[in-house]
């Protein structure tokens, strides 16, 4: 049995992990300007891609997705309840949206949400990613693809598993 203080500590750790700004890190590694200074001003993979450096954008995308996946995966392996895993999932996601290290002005959370969904339920994550890919290829707009992929995520969750605690987490991710 885990100690009573483990869930709040896990949630705090997940929030701090979510706050790690991979767009800033990859931009520095590749000698690029601060991604908040161009394009949409958003510290995310799509805006880093606007710099013209696909490798930096890919590093950002992978880093942002991995932090979402890792937080949930570790919480699962530690034996936390589904409710605590849901809190950890939301904490890492909101850490990306409102990072303490960037004065609470973060990215849109698309890659981090994808990582969270892949860890919570790989089939659900793949369904959402498939929807995103289809829309992105059809319309060539990442933001439109994100909205149209997130919207049916709770429906996919209910179709696959019925309504459960994860449905609430998936719904919050979709609405954010």
PLM features: what roles do these ranges have?
Residues 126, 142-150, 163-174:
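Loop-to-transmembrane alpha-helix initiation sites
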Residues 23-26, 46-47, 95-105, 132-139:
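C-terminal ends of transmembrane helices
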Residues 6, 10, 56-62, 66-100, ...:
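Nucleotide and nucleotide-moiety/phosphate-recognizing core
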Residues 33-42, 101-114, 141-149:
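Short, non-helical or kinked segments that cap or interrupt transmembrane helices
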Residues 24-56:
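Cytosolic, membrane-interface loops and tails of multi-pass inner-membrane proteins
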Residues 14-19, 92-96, 132-136, 153, ...:
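Alpha-helical transmembrane segments of multi-pass membrane proteins
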Residues 5-30:
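N-terminal signal-anchor transmembrane alpha helix
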Residues 49-52, 75-78, 110-139, 151-161:
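Interfacial segments of multi-pass membrane proteins
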